[in-house]
Every structure is written in structure tokens, then in C-alpha cells.
Design a protein with these regions (language model features):
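Left-handed beta-helix
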Residues: 3, 8-9, 14-15, 20-21, ...
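Terminal amphipathic alpha-helical/low-complexity segments used for targeting or macromolecular assembly
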Residues: 52-61
Length: 61
């Protein structure tokens, strides 16, 4: 059985990003180009790399 990928509201996904099954991309999250997302990314996070790691949290104004 395959697991679904969940992409929440206002998330930005860069070109050539791979997202593994069962992963959730949080609301307002940004995933950098070419990243490989192996685990959940929280709301308001910027994640990049292989594997994708959170490098910054976006502050709400």
C-alpha cells in the first residue's frame, strides 16, 4: 500500500523536488529546488537539501 503526500495551504515546492510517501509539507512552508524531502516539514519552515533540512523558520508579522 502507498502512503499519501500531504501539502498544506500556501506551501511552495521548488522544481525537481522529490517528496517521499507519507510526508506532510506544512502550511506556508518553502521547499528549495532539488530537495529530497524524507520527513515532515513543519508550518512556516524553509527546508533545503538532500535530505531536506529546516534552515529557517518564517516569522509571521
Amino acid at each position: 500500500m502507498t502512503k499519501k503526500i500531504h501539502i498544506k495551504k500556501n506551501a511552495w515546492i521548488g522544481a525537481r523536488v522529490n517528496i517521499l510517501p507519507g510526508v506532510t509539507i506544512g502550511e506556508n512552508a518553502i521547499i528549495g529546488t532539488g530537495s529530497i524531502v524524507t520527513k515532515d516539514i513543519p508550518d512556516n519552515a524553509v527546508a533545503v537539501g538532500n535530505p531536506a533540512m529546516v534552515v529557517k523558520m518564517i516569522e509571521k508579522k
